[in-house]
Amino acid sequence: MVQSLKIILWGEEIGRLAWDVKRRLSYFMYNPAFLKKGLNISPLAAPVDGVGLMPVWGEEAKIYQKLPAFLADSLPDSWGNQLFELWRQQNHLSNTDITPLDKLSFIGKRGMGALEFLPEVSRERKAEKIDIKSLANLAERIFSERENARILPEESVTMQSLLTVGTSAGGRQPKAIVAINRKNGEVRSGQISGLEEFDYYLVKFGNSQYSSAELEMSYYELATMAGINMIDRKSVV
């Protein structure tokens, strides 16, 4: 169980997040050095001029999972939670010992926003080639089987790739953050920055039971036909 985390923003520690075992609630304390800058990163939930050195306690509402509101948005979403649950089972961790801080530590530096959470669960980042087809097939099986999903020995490498590129992307449907070589189409983890000749994409996997990815593509094309400026997209599988 993670007891405390450093919260990092743009390379600077803005404060610490801790877990109160008795209250089963988290609390956040600003870094005094950060407070002196007067940068109001959460003016409604945790204003720097109104909080000072007082703890910002987590919210009781289920949606916040015992975290302060401005930190809860970094938690894994529905799809990320499915992958986190598989990771927990693989590592033989009791569900009763898991707190929201463990989930934030699992996200670490891979979140979609600017916040980073240290220490992070150790997973070596490598710019190895990813088999996007195997990734898509495993993602669909996990999504459809839900809590009954079990990872086969021959799927262990693909599962590690999926944990790396798939847990931080929000939303309900399976997706992953990848880097695609613009010359040969090679796919690598999108968590590795600065890869030359690679463009970065949020990949949304299809579903053989429901054409969610195809529907999103249709809406994309309708938007471009209507003259709306959209980011680049491509079909990779």
Give a label for each model feature.
Residues 1-237:
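Phosphate/dinucleotide-binding and metal-coordinating scaffold of catalytic cores
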